[in-house]
């Protein structure tokens, strides 16, 4: 807590004092060091989010049940929350998948994820999740869920041998823009995509002069041409069998992405995470790596 000096005034809040007392009771009821770490994280989150009533209530309730939640259930809860909520904005597909693989690996740590219904019923009893009705609803499988979540990688692109590509290349060349930013689509070998930032104001031309790189900002005409090109590549196609098949080939090249797919696709029933569960998931994930973002 000393890292949060600016929040020390929270100790004067009677409600926080009550929460702290509950944390002490939970700690006394547990003999697992992992529980102490989760409780510490929850107290920090309570200090940081105390002005938001629903969040505060969820954190306070999570503190009361920490000693009652198994580590397997915590791991499954945190994993589900992260897969469902955290995205990647890496411009290249392989970089984005590598980032997700690294993130999931921090939660899994080569341990098994819970299967069956027992861990879900356990979390439901503790009000960390709400179980759906069997047979009424189910989660989308990874091969459908992830393309929707990572839709930026499913731009259709433009046929390599098309007149449209040739016109764009000619326009780039005649206006001092490099044509090597047209690259093969990672999910469709017949098409090109643009390997440039989608915000034209962030784009620049980089020249290699001797041992140094020089960045030259774009003029307004170049920005207009670039924006026009970006717009022509914008169409997303999540129903393309070619791209979906290739995407899953990439996905299965990564150890933890594979494990997540097997686990996610075997979830036995639909459920939703409550504010209590969100607090637990965030706190547990943060104890494993404090660089994992907390998403409430």
Residue ranges and their predicted role:
Residues 36-44, 94, 111, 116, ...:
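Accessory beta->alpha helical hairpin/"wing" motif in late/C-terminal subdomains of nucleic-acid enzymes
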Residues 52-92:
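Short alpha-helical segments that sit at the start of domains
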């Amino acid at each position: 807590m000393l890292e949060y000096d600016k929040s020390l005034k929270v100790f004067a809040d009677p409600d926080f004092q009550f929460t702290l007392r509950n944390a002490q009771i939970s700690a006394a009821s547990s003999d697992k060091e992992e529980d102490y770490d989760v409780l510490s994280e929850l107290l920090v989150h309570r200090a940081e989010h105390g002005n938001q009533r629903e969040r505060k209530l969820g954190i306070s309730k999570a503190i009361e049940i920490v000693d009652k939640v198994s580590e397997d259930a915590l791991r499954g809860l945190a994993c589900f929350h992260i897969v469902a909520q955290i995205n990647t904005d890496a411009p290249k597909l392989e970089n984005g998948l590598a980032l997700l693989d690294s993130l999931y690996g921090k939660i899994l740590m080569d341990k098994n994820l819970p299967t069956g219904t027992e861990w879900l019923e356990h979390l439901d009893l503790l009000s960390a999740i709400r179980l759906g009705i069997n047979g009424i609803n189910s989660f989308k499988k990874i091969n459908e869920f992830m393309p929707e979540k990572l839709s930026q990688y499913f731009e259709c692109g433009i046929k390599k041998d098309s007149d449209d590509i040739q016109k764009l290349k000619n326009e780039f060349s005649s206006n001092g823009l490099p044509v090597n930013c047209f690259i093969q689509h990672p999910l469709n070998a017949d098409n090109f995509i643009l390997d440039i930032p989608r915000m034209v104001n962030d784009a620049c031309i980089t020249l290699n002069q001797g041992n140094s790189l020089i960045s030259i900002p774009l003029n307004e005409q170049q920005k207009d041409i670039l924006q026009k090109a970006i717009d022509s590549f914008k169409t997303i196609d999540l129903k393309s069998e070619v791209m979906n098949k290739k995407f899953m080939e990439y996905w299965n090249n990564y150890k933890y992405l594979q494990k997540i797919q097997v686990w996610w696709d075997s979830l036995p029933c639909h459920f939703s995470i409550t504010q209590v569960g969100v607090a637990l998931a965030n706190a547990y994930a943060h104890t494993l790596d404090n660089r994992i973002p907390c998403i409430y």
